[in-house]
Amino acid sequence: VTLPKVIAYMEHCRWEWLRDPSLGLARWVHEGHGFFVLNQSIAMSRRFGQGQDCEVRCVLRKVGRSVAQGDQDVVRADGVLLARCAIRGAWMAPTGRLAKIPAVLKEAVSEASLGSERGQAAPGDADSLFDPPQPLRTGALDLSICEEIPVDAHRRVVEVRASDCDIFKHVNAANYVRYIADSLSVQGASPSLHRAELSYRGQARAGDSIEVVTWPSGDTHWSADIRRGDESLFRATVDTESL
């Protein structure tokens, strides 16, 4: 399972959570309100393949007037941590403008642990695509965004397809990260990402011509800026060190 797939899975589960009647936001969500993710810090701590039962746990940490923060873990059925994410998002009205978060959401704020554990490595099969071994990594969320683009950065132009867009008709973080992985592969770098710091700044839509700019920023770290003309749509630093 690749990092873009994990990001997409976590987003899908967040929308399910927002629609849960017990959270109290279902009415607003069905009217077209929702959280626009501004920042994500995500790390996979283990490989995981097909056929493994897992669940996504989510907790709300902080709620402001229009911005909220939360944590998510993807855990194996036995509670062992597979991936971890910290998210910061803005509450948007159907018009696309910032809106005040409903007061009911503050009741869901919690300092409780998500309950995942480091656990033991599952044995797996070293030669198996579907049941790989699960070596443990730290899963630290400590990358930083690089703002300066070097003059020799690699540049690749991408035409946004309709199939790259979500139900809101724009490219989400998972597909932005997929563009970055594809660009690294073109350069001969590892497209196998396991950790990323993401800053979502603008919306690309079907038919847009965007430029994916990537450059090395550490031993196994690469930074990226996805642009539409002079506008920066997405910034990221990713870690390509193999699990």
Regions found by a protein language model. Give the residues of each.
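Active-site-flanking structural segment that lines cofactor/substrate pockets
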Residues: H30-Q50
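HotDog/MaoC-like acyl-thioester-processing domains
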Residues: A43-L143, Y200, A204-S209, W215-L243
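Hot-dog-fold acyl-thioester-processing enzymes
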Residues: V1-V37, A90-H194, L243
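Hydrophobic residues on conserved beta-strands that form the core of alpha/beta folds
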Residues: V37-N39, Q69-G70, R84, L193-R195
